[in-house]
């Protein structure tokens, strides 16, 4: 399927290109190696049918049948995370890995309800992630934002309780953003208006985003913008089906956080080449390229960039545009954005020979 | 035994014209048409080409429904009862016979909307309505559209031609003449009612529509209590269908504890899920059909959706669904609250759309109240987050929650209270009109017409306001109450279910303008005069355009309003809206407005 070869020069360029990640579930970075370590450390008993070795689990991860199949493993994976250190370690191993891939800024998701339902407090989970974020800033100069996601398949009342329990974390700005994930179609955005309004009432600076338009039709995207008042859409691939929406996304600079490898793994499209990336570029709809649940979907952020290159080719100028719109669409302060933008120019200038 | 058919003369003797005229109000339009085709006597008496009395009766039956709070009750004391649209048409079209006024109302009227355009609530989007021009839109450097600032016609069915370009139906050989009485009633709009986030629109055929992606805007209404959920027939059908295939399971739910084998019984089997699934893909065909039917849009307009009762989907197997059930319920009235609405059907059954999860109307049951055949519902009214209806011989009935529906039938009990001493059927204490506010607060006036009553926190009390003349009609929103006397009208603010006495204001436009109807949105008001003119005032938030007075700059430069905060405009005095026609009905939603406008 690959049409364009990722030469060493291309790979080096895309590695060095400053990247921002806006769509990454920390729970989705749990590699089989760490999973089995935690099983041992925490004395967790896995179901009898669960694979016994790292390699067997890798084989399963490479062969998900669909979203449901993936989620079954995903939620078992979550069960091995118990202490603050576990959460720290999970996020820290992600940052270590991507620090060599040119990642400069990360806005990462986590699902408190996957943990609070197991009796682990929101504070423990958040503290672990927060520590890893601070360390990433310190050691790798990766700036970060923490986004708490609500699980849309859970009852709305439970999501409200989650928001309420996060009040002090939202007020103090430890949680920078609110998101919404899990099965989209049966649980439309209008169910969560009150959750979003409540969260925003805690802190006017709270940023809002939500998964929409992955499985659901474009009206899910429109309603997410109108009703939840988000400034960003996670996934949003299916927006392309609605010309009016495309105009709106471009005009209001609503960034879509696309996840190419995830879309293929979960059979949203058969191949990365089928994604409407060129159409988004042509219509000036800003998007960023992200890894979603990289441990499960066979590739971290750089791999996603490389896969997209192999299907679309694209010149240095287009990649610079993607890097810039990812920075512009980030929630970091103007000074940080300026730093990153000048880094983009430096890298682009450095690869003089690349078309 | 052989019966002899009575002659025309015999019928005339037993049913003289004055008797027939007296019973006309009790017949449906269709009954009257059938009667007119019975024999020569009735055919001559009920002369569709000449009888103004007949057409007046048909007009009132079709367009003057008194089931909602737009009109007061018809009572012995209201001698010359006229609905708002009758009053307006008689004033604006003096000397025109009722057959022509009927046709005017039916064929030359259209729904216009303006204000906040979010999620299609106006019944159109920026690109779906060719009648929307750039000068009708409040935009920020052409990127963000805040709203529509002038009344714009909603695209409705076969009428691709805007109303101003349409032929008059009574003075030419228009084909519409053919379908005049028994034909297509879907084009003719009887009522429009504004909710917090949408409009509900009722056609002469009894079909109910709602604009936009959601009527509730994500807020819960006076439906099931927190934490309770209705039984969802279509979802249940999907679930049982999926259960019949052992390897397939429905929407997942995380449960159990760490390592609990229940959570994932056999991962190797679930890996084969897709295979099993695809072999039986056609099991979804009937369901998809049912799902399509259950969310039907207006032909040619995706922003207007048909609203159906839940009870028609009472089938366990989608194959058993009888498509003709769709038209089995005919609605005659609709009233809207902030994030809910009520509709009454021609059998006097009441349906409620009252929450985020309620896509189809739940039929309400009032346990222990007498049967509708003896004690019908005479008027329905939605408040902000509650409802009030008037039942003959029972009185005012209020509620703000209900049981959940449990089975396929789609019924639920309302958690209602009857306001004491409101059930008189005649005399000075008979209720003349009422208006529903929020949290089960209800304002009402009686035949005696001198006291305003407030039922709130389960206590009735009377409110003394310095109002001149007899009170004949009340209307309310979340924060405003309007009181009509025989001569004028007043508004007063409501705070925490109490009247703020010092805010009593007489609505005065000019001495010769008489207001006959008022409606309030979150921050704006609309008034309708007896000559079909429309006036608006209040706050236009965030450039939403709900006043319909044009662009913010022109409102301010004309002196009608002033800027308030960043992007809001305050218009203090009721200001006339340019509509180029005769307005016969108005409604204010949350941040949007609607009207039915006739263009000659």
UniProtKB/Swiss-Prot annotation, chain A:
Protein EC: 3.5.4.2
Positions annotated to bind Zn(2+): 23, 25, 211, 292
Main localization category: cytoplasm
Pfam families linked to this entry: A_deaminase
InterPro entries linked: A/AMP_deam_AS, A_deaminase_dom, ADE, Ado/ade_deaminase, Metal_Hydrolase
Cofactor remark from the record: Binds 1 zinc ion per subunit.
GO molecular function: adenine deaminase activity; zinc ion binding
Top-level EC class: hydrolase
Binding annotation for substrate: 293
Location of the protein in the cell: Cytoplasm; Nucleus
Function field: Catalyzes the hydrolytic deamination of adenine to hypoxanthine. Plays an important role in the purine salvage pathway and in nitrogen catabolism.
Identification of the protein by name: Adenine deaminase
Lineage: Eukaryota, Fungi, Dikarya, Ascomycota, Saccharomycotina
């Amino acid at each position: 399927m690959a049409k364009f070869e990722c030469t060493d020069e291309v790979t080096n360029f895309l590695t060095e290109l400053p990247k921002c990640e806006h769509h990454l579930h920390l729970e989705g970075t749990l590699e089989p190696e760490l999973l089995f370590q935690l099983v041992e450390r925490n004395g967790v008993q896995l179901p009898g049918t669960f694979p016994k070795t790292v390699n067997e689990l890798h084989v399963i991860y490479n062969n998900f049948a669909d979203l449901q199949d993936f989620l079954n493993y995903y939620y078992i994976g979550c069960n091995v995370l118990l202490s603050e250190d576990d959460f720290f370690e999970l996020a820290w191993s992600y940052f270590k890995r991507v620090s060599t891939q040119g990642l400069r800024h990360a806005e990462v998701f986590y699902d408190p309800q996957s943990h609070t339902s197991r009796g682990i407090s929101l504070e423990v989970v958040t503290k672990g992630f927060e520590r890893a974020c601070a360390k990433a800033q310190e050691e790798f100069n990766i700036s970060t934002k923490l986004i708490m996601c609500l699980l849309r398949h859970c009852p709305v009342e439970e999501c409200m309780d989650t928001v309420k329990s996060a009040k002090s974390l939202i007020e103090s700005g430890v949680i920078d953003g609110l998101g919404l994930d899990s099965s989209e179609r049966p649980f439309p955005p209008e169910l969560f208006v009150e959750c979003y309004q409540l969260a925003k009432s805690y802190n006017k600076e709270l940023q809002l985003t939500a998964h929409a338009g992955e499985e659901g039709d474009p009206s899910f995207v429109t309603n997410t913008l109108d009703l939840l008042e988000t400034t960003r859409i996670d996934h949003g691939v299916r927006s392309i089906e609605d010309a009016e929406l495309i105009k709106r996304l471009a005009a209001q600079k609503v960034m879509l956080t696309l996840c190419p490898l995830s879309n293929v793994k979960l059979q949203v499209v058969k191949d990365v080449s089928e994604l409407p990336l060129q159409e988004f570029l042509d219509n000036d709809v800003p998007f960023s390229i992200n890894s979603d649940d990289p441990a499960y979907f066979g590739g971290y952020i750089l791999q996603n960039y490389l896969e997209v290159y192999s299907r679309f080719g694209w010149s240095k100028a287009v990649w610079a545009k993607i890097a810039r719109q990812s920075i512009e669409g980030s929630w970091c302060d103007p000074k940080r954005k300026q730093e990153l933008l000048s880094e983009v120019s430096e890298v682009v200038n450095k690869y003089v020979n690349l078309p | 035994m052989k019966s002899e058919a009575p002659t025309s003369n015999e019928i005339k003797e037993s049913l003289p014209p004055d008797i027939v005229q007296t019973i006309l109000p009790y017949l449906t339009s269709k009954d009257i048409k059938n009667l007119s085709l019975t024999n020569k006597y009735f055919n001559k008496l009920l002369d569709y080409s000449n009888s103004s009395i007949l057409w007046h009766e048909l007009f009132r039956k079709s367009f003057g429904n008194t089931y909602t709070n737009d009109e007061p009750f018809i009572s012995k004391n209201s001698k010359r009862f006229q609905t708002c649209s009758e009053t307006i048409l008689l004033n604006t079209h003096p000397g025109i016979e009722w057959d022509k006024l009927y046709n005017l109302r039916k064929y030359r009227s259209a729904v216009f909307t303006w204000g906040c355009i979010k999620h299609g609530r106006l019944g159109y989007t920026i690109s779906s309505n060719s009648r929307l021009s750039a000068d009708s839109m409040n935009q920020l450097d052409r990127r963000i559209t805040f709203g529509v600032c002038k009344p714009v016609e909603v695209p409705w069915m076969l009428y691709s031609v805007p109303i101003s370009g349409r032929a008059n139906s009574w003075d030419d050989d228009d084909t519409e003449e053919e379908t005049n009485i028994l034909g297509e009633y879907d084009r003719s709009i009887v009522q429009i009612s504004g909710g917090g986030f949408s409009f509900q629109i009722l056609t002469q055929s009894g079909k109910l529509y709602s604009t936009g992606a959601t009527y509730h805007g994500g807020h819960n209404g006076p439906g099931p209590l927190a934490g309770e959920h209705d039984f969802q027939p279509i979802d249940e059908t999907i679930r049982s269908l999926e259960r019949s295939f052992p390897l397939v399971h429905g929407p997942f739910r995380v449960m159990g504890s760490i390592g609990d084998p229940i959570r994932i019984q056999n991962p190797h089997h679930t890996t084969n899920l897709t295979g099993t699934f695809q072999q039986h893909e056609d099991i979804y065909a009937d369901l998809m059909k049912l799902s399509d039917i259950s969310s039907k849009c207006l032909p040619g307009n995706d922003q207007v959706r048909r609203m159906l009762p839940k009870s028609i989907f009472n089938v366990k197997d989608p194959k058993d669904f009888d498509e003709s059930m769709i038209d089995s319920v005919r609605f005659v009235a609709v009233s809207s609250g902030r994030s809910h609405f009520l509709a009454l059907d021609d059998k006097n059954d009441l349906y409620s759309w009252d929450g985020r999860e309620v896509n189809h109307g739940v039929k309400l049951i009032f346990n222990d109240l007498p049967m509708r055949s003896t004690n019908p519902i005479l008027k329905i009214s939605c408040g902000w987050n509650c409802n009030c209806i008037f039942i003959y011989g029972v009185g005012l009935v209020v509620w703000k929650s209900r049981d959940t529906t449990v089975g396929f039938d789609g019924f639920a009990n309302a958690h209602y209270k009857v306001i004491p001493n409101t059930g008189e059927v005649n005399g000075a204490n008979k209720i003349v009109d009422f208006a529903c506010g929020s949290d089960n607060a209800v304002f009402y006036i009686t035949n005696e017409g001198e006291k305003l009553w407030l039922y709130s926190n389960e206590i009735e009390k009377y409110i003394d306001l310095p109002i001149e003349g007899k009170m004949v009609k009340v209307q309310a929103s979340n924060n405003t109450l309007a009181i009509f006397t025989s001569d004028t009208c007043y508004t007063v603010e409501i705070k925490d279910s109490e009247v703020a006495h010092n805010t009593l204001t007489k609505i005065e436009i000019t001495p010769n303008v008489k207001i006959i109807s008022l409606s309030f949105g979150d921050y704006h008001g609309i008034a309708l005069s007896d000559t079909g003119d429309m006036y608006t005032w209040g706050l236009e938030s965030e450039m939403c355009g709900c006043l319909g007075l044009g662009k913010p700059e022109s409102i301010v430069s004309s002196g009608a309003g002033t800027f308030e905060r960043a992007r809001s405009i305050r218009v203090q005095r009721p200001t006339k809206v340019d509509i180029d026609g005769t307005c016969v009905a108005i409604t204010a939603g949350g941040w949007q407005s609607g009207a039915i406008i006739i263009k000659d």
